[in-house]
Amino acid sequence: MPTIQQLVRKGREVLVEKSKSPALDSCPQRRGVCVRVYTTTPKKPNSAMRKVARVRLTNSKEVNSYIPGEGHNLQEHSIVLVRGGRVKDLPGVRYHIVRGTLDTAGVAGRTQRRSKYGAKRPKAGQAAAPAKGKGKK
């Protein structure tokens, strides 16, 4: 516990809040160009081939960003919209690409949680396609 005189001399140090997505420069999203599109493996104990893109943002910073959903149409020089949000089992991936905007297509055949994957609403007359792996053998 400091004395009053010590506080007068030095004062309390203010804690600075650190951003979890510093490359966005306090913006909700940023536009960018894909520099490299590749797959990588997650940390233990998970196993998969996660789709990731290296993106150069409009503020000339480069970030690794995750491509959510099944399948994508991204390649080098694709224009994408990047938002914050890390992927827990991929070290160094602190951003997500927004599906269904700019050059990024929405996830095809998606019927639930469509807004998160940029999928359009299916036509009312069409029967829902059977879900993968749920059919009878």
Curated annotation (Swiss-Prot):
The modification 3-methylthioaspartic acid is found at residue 89. Pfam families: Ribosom_S12_S23. One of its GO terms (molecular function) is structural constituent of ribosome. Keywords: Methylation, Ribonucleoprotein, Ribosomal protein, RNA-binding, rRNA-binding, tRNA-binding. It comes from the Bacteria. InterPro entries: NA-bd_OB-fold, Ribosomal_uS12, Ribosomal_uS12_bac. PROSITE patterns: RIBOSOMAL_S12. Residues 105-137 are annotated as: Disordered. GO terms for biological process: translation. With S4 and S5 plays an important role in translational accuracy. Interacts with and stabilizes bases of the 16S rRNA that are involved in tRNA selection in the A site and with the mRNA backbone. Located at the interface of the 30S and 50S subunits, it traverses the body of the 30S subunit contacting proteins on the other side and probably holding the rRNA structure together. The combined cluster of proteins S8, S12 and S17 appears to hold together the shoulder and platform of the 30S subunit. This is Small ribosomal subunit protein uS12. The lineage of its organism: Bacteria, Pseudomonadati, Bacteroidota, Bacteroidia, Bacteroidales.
